[in-house]
C-alpha cells in the first residue's frame, strides 16, 4: 500500500510540474510579441528634439536615484511607485523612463525584478524622504571611513572601468545632477565618421554623456585610500540612455526575461594571470620576463583580494591556482540579476589594484589566449527565485524541456555569441587548441559534466542544474556576456523548438544543422551582423559600434602590436 501511495504522489507531482511548464510556455507565446518588439532606430542619441531638455534631464535624474537594490547597503528597502509611460515609437517622441519595483538578488528565494527592457530604461523613483534616508546612511559611511573621494564608475565596451573621482563634499550634488564625461571614453572608436558607423551623427561622438549613480552600489574601496566607488549608468545630456552602454543592454535583456516569468541566477568564473613587474618598462622593451610569482604558496595576495571583494559586495565562493604557473581561478557566488556582472566588473579593477600593492601585474588579456577563460555559469529560475527551471525532480543528469530549449537557443546563436565572448584575435585560439587541423570553424559542443564542451551542463550541487557557457574569455565584457546569453536563451524559449528539444525524459538534443564556431574574428563579426535575433536584442546602434570597433582593431592589428602589449595593464 505504501508503494502504491508513493507512486500516486509521484504521478501527482509530475502532473503538477507538467501543468506548470505548460502554463509557462503558454505565457511565453503570449508575451513573445511584447518582448520582441523591435526598436525604432530612426531617433537615436544625438537626434532627438532637445526642447525642454532641462525638464527632461531633471526628471531623468530623479528617476535614477535608487537604481538596482539587489545589495542595499545604505537606507532601508521600500516599495516604489510604478509609472507607466509611452514607448519610443516614433522619431518625434522622446523616450521616457518607466520605473519598476526594485530587485532583491542576494538569495535565491528573493524576488527578482530587472530594470529595463527593449523600449524603456526602467529605474526606480526615489521620493525625497527616501533619498534623504539613503544619503544619510551613505554620509555616515563616508564619515566613519573618513572618505575624501568617490569614484563614479562606468564600463566601456571592453569592460574596463572608466571613472571620475569626485571630492566627498560634492557627492550629494553629483548624485542629483550626475557627472559629465566625454562619450568617446566609453565607445573607444577614434571617430565614427572614419569607420562609417554613423555619418549623420558623427558629431555626437565628441559630446559629453552623464554618469548617474546607482546608490545601492556605493561601497568603500578596500584597495584605495579613503575612497569609495559607485557604479553608474550612462545617459546623454538630454536624459536618454546611452544605447551602447553594456550595463544598460544587460539590464534590458534581464527585464525581457522577467516579462516571460523567469529570473537568472548566475556567476562568473575567471582565469587571470599574475606577472612580476620588470624593473625597466618602456614602449620598445616592454616584457614580462620576471618569473611568475603567484602559485599555491602565495596566499596573502589572494586572501587580500578575496577579502576586498567581499567588502565591495562581491562574494567569492572559491579560488585556487590553475593549470599554469601564475594562473589563478576565482569563482563568484551565484546571484540574481545584474549583480553577477557587477561583481565581475568589480573584480577586473580590484585585482589590478591589489596586485599593484605587491608589485605584480594582473591581466585578463593574454596574447597566447590559453590562460584566460571567462565562464558564465547560469540557471533559469521562476520570477520569485524559488524554483530552478532547468531541474527535473528525478535529480539525474537531465534538463527539463525549458532547459533544453534554452540550450538550443545558445547552440543556435553560438557563432554570433562567440564574437561577443571572445572579442580579440588571441581569445579565439582557445577554440582550436584541441585540434591541429587547419579549419575555418569548429563544432559547438555540449554535454553533461564535461568540462571540454562549449556548453557544460552540471546537475550536481545544492543549486541544481546549471549551464556553463564556456565560449567566453576573461577579456570579454561581463555585461555583454550576460546580455548575449540571455538573448540567445530567450530566443530558444520563444521559438518552436519542440522537435529540437526532444522528449522530457531524454538526455539527447537533436540538431538538424549542427552549429559551428568561427575561428577567425572576421568570420565571427559576419555571423554577428547576420544574426537578426541578437541584432534586435542588443540593439542596432550597439552592433554598429561594436563591429566598427573590432574592424578597426583588425585593420590596425600589426601596427598596434606594441600598443597591444600595454593592454595587459588595463584588461
From Swiss-Prot:
SMART domains given in the database record: Gln-synt_C
Origin superkingdom: Eukaryota
Alphabetical list of Gene3D superfamilies matching this protein: Glutamine synthetase, N-terminal domain, Glutamine synthetase/guanido kinase, catalytic domain
Polar residues bias spans: 103-129
Residue ranges occupied by any GS beta-grasp domain in the UniProt entry: 145-239
Domain named GS catalytic: residues: 246-571
Stretches the record annotates as Disordered: 1-129
Role: May act as a component of the cytoskeleton or as a chaperone for the reorganization of intermediate filament proteins during terminal differentiation in the lens. Does not seem to have enzymatic activity.
Family statement drawn from the similarity comment of this UniProt entry: Belongs to the glutamine synthetase family.
Subunit structure: Dodecamer. Interacts with BFSP2 and VIM.
CC annotations in GO: cytoplasm; membrane
Biased composition (Basic and acidic residues): 11-24
Protein name listed in UniProt: Lengsin
A single BP term in Gene Ontology: glutamine biosynthetic process
Cross-referenced PANTHER family: GLUTAMINE SYNTHETASE, LENGSIN
Basic residues: bias regions: 26-36
